[in-house]
């Protein structure tokens, strides 16, 4: 049973820390881990947020890619025959490698929450801020000469899961749909930290890094297409 497998790293829950505050993309827990992150604006409105949250809950944006599948073995509800993610439930990814083999990697969900309201404070500065973001790293540098706290309300749907024994990698991955109540924006963000967990993982590392370089961008594109189809009634 995947639920009973031990987590294969010492940073359990790290991807969920500070996510209700300003640290949306935490730095790597140690220098040996690599960070991947991407954030895109999907549009505006609570209706869009609901559509995107449903897509996230069923991992449709991942399963739509064709070369990777997410499987949640159990936990259906009376209102849906489809498995839904809940805390501490098992999750497996099945990925096609080079078009010739499928690799199964076990995980465990550590955070599954939907439509959670958060209230935080943000700091507004009077100086310029340099902000660079890529699919692999996010860095923010600024000089604070004067700050002013303003309320920030957000509605969040989030799924975060950790690797367990038997996975090629060690680390965590997190997906969120965020509705900013203040400006009506809907954000889709993705974050992970990882490194190889065993010899096979190190051998496969060049391919894994190549895939990680495009994985979030592909899911962002799939999310947009699925939303468009839903809005068109297809």
Identify what each model region corresponds to.
Residues 1-99, 135-138:
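Hydrophobic ligand-binding cavity/cleft-lining segments
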Residues 41-43, 178-180, 193-195:
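Solvent-exposed residues in well-ordered beta-strands and their adjoining turns
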């Amino acid at each position: 049973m995947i639920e009973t497998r031990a987590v294969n790293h010492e940073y359990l829950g790290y991807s969920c820390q500070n996510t209700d505050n300003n640290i949306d993309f935490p730095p790597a827990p140690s220098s040996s881990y690599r960070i991947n992150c991407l954030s895109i604006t999907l549009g505006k409105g609570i209706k869009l947020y609901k559509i995107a949250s449903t897509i996230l809950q069923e991992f449709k944006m991942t399963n739509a890619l064709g070369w990777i599948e997410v499987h949640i073995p159990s936990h259906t509800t009376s209102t849906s025959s489809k498995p839904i993610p809940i805390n501490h439930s098992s999750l497996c990814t099945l990925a096609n490698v080079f078009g010739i083999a499928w690799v199964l990697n076990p995980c465990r969900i550590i955070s599954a929450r939907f439509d959670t309201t958060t209230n935080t404070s943000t700091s507004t500065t009077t100086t310029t801020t340099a902000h660079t973001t890529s699919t692999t790293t996010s860095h923010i540098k600024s000089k604070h000469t004067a700050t002013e706290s303003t309320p920030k309300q957000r509605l969040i749907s989030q799924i975060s899961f950790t690797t367990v024994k038997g996975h090629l990698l060690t680390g965590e991955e997190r997906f969120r749909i965020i509705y900013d109540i203040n400006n009506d924006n809907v954000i889709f963000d993705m974050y992970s930290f990882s490194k190889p967990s065993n010899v096979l993982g190190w051998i496969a590392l060049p391919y894994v890094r190549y895939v990680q370089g495009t994985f979030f961008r592909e899911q962002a594109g799939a999310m947009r297409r699925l939303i468009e189809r839903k809005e068109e009634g297809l």
